[in-house]
Amino acid sequence: MGRGIAVAFAYAGHNVTMIDVKSRSAEQFAILEADALDELRKTLASLTRFGLLNPEQAEAVIARVTIAPSDASAATLAKAGLVFEGVPEVVELKRKVLAAASRVVDPEIIIASTTSTILVDDLSGAIEKPERFLNVHWLNPAYLIPLVEISPGNQTDPAITEEVKSLLEGIGKVPVVCAATPGFIVPRIQALAMNEAARMVDEGVASAADIDKAIRYGFGFRYAVLGLLEFIDWGGGDILYYASRYLEAALGSDRYRAPDVISRNMQEGRIGMRTGAGFLDYSDLDIDAYRDQRLSALVEMLRHFGLARPPVLD
């Protein structure tokens, strides 16, 4: 993940130093450095083939990235403008690295963990200034996926959260903020969907190829344009409520049960677009224009997949 983040920042014009936190001989470090830079060059070469930049620009981007050995970490961190920790998902290892970094950085520097699993408050106790610490979860490949999930802790200064949001927006990312909760937003939803897909293969519901086709051309197609909660509002929360009751009974599992918020919304008349509010508020929205915009985006998705076709007239 660290190498992908390095590409994202270097591509956006920032100088980046990746620090090797493991002690190595000079020869071992040289091998690691060559491997890291080679991977970055291959990444930029692929982006060049895809038309995002030209070879000269790729060289300029790679020139912004350096690799520092562990014995130079203190001096490197002392000059850092922002620190991302990206060591393996081991709590004590992360705490050790974060503690060491927080002792040598400028007191006004923001430190972020890129953990995908560990709660921010399980790490913040190792930080000298926990008010300037938060989790910043990237999705692989970090240099392509726009979304970045920001998870501040109990001690995180709200101004730091806003500063990180602005920084990420400045490099072309789309940040969202979520509470300190296991799984953030995407991994939590993703785990449910992936496990259900695997379960359907195991149950013989459909082949792996057809399930993936259903996701690409149905589920993913729709949700590239509409958010999950937005789509609930499109059809109405009542539809989800009754569909969930049927699935729970038919499949004999409470994993399909609608959460309490769905029935509360129904009781309060917050069904969705047809009542002017659901999870989102539509009261001041030009519904026809809004629908047209979303439907137009779906047409563009059809074109992207090569599935848009003229009507049959004969």
Where are these regions (language model features)?
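NAD(P)-dependent Rossmann-like dehydrogenase/reductase catalytic/cofactor-binding core
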Residues: 12, 173-180, 203, 208-314
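NAD(P)+-binding Rossmann beta1-loop-alpha1 motif at the extreme N-terminus of oxidoreductases
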Residues: 1-43
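Internal alpha-helical scaffold of NAD(P)-dependent oxidoreductase catalytic cores
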Residues: 12-15, 129, 148-181, 193-221
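Rossmann-fold NAD(P)-binding glycine/threonine-rich loop
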Residues: 89-166
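Hydrophobic/aromatic beta-strand patches that form the interior of the parallel beta-sheet core
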Residues: 17-19, 66-68, 84, 112, ...
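A structured beta-alpha segment of the ubiquitous adenosine-cofactor-binding alpha/beta core
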Residues: 44-104
